[in-house]
């Protein structure tokens, strides 16, 4: 009855591989990417506005890398849409920084990569599973038709509880968000195909 939480990079391919080699049902294999990326997005918004990160909600979908999709329309501060609180220019700078945050950490550390924030993200997921909290978290989930994707692990919001991925929450993506998500899916598929997992 265990749940496999994959945190190793390249995340998108490793979670697909983990599912294949484990033999576990798809709901019991989940990737961490979106939890970490969403936390970084939330942190950057909080720092820019000088507010507690606890009051910021945000989602980052898609692959774990340069093609991730921070959803600005779903970002709020105490329920207030972020676009009401800062300029589009600042928002786009935060989106760009979110996409490059992993590289930023590597550059600052000089050796190795991030370890504290991924550990905290994995802990957040494990706690939701072990305590059956049913948290809504952005995780790499195997999609079977949701978001128009079949048979591929991609970062999307899900309910995470004792059963692992208890359900995928399907958002209606439009315009640039839909286009960016579809491009991210293409990138994830290419990575999975390249690594032959």
Which residues fall in each region the model found?
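C-terminal substrate-binding/catalytic lobe of Rossmann-fold NAD(P)-dependent dehydrogenases
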Residues: 22-28, 36-197
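Rossmann-like NAD(P)(H) cofactor-binding subdomain of soluble oxidoreductases
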Residues: 1-42
């Amino acid at each position: 009855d265990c749940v496999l939480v994959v945190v190793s990079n390249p995340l998108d391919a490793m979670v697909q591989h983990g599912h294949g080699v484990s033999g576990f049902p798809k709901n019991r294999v989940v990737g961490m990417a979106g939890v970490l990326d969403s936390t970084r997005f939330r942190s950057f918004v909080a720092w820019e506005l000088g507010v507690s990160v606890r009051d910021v909600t945000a989602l980052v979908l898609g692959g774990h890398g340069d093609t991730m999709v921070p959803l600005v329309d779903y970002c709020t501060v105490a329920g207030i849409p972020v676009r009401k609180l800062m300029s589009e220019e600042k928002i786009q700078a935060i989106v760009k920084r979110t996409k490059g945050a992993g590289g930023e950490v590597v550059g600052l550390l000089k050796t190795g990569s991030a370890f504290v924030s991924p550990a905290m993200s994995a802990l957040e997921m494990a706690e939701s599973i072990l305590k059956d909290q049913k948290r809504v978290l952005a995780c790499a989930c195997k999609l079977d038709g949701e978001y128009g994707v079949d048979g591929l692990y991609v970062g999307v919001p899900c309910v995470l509880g004792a059963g692992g991925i208890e359900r995928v929450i399907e958002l209606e993506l439009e315009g640039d968000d839909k286009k960016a998500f579809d491009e991210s899916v293409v990138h994830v598929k290419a990575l999975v195909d390249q690594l032959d997992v």
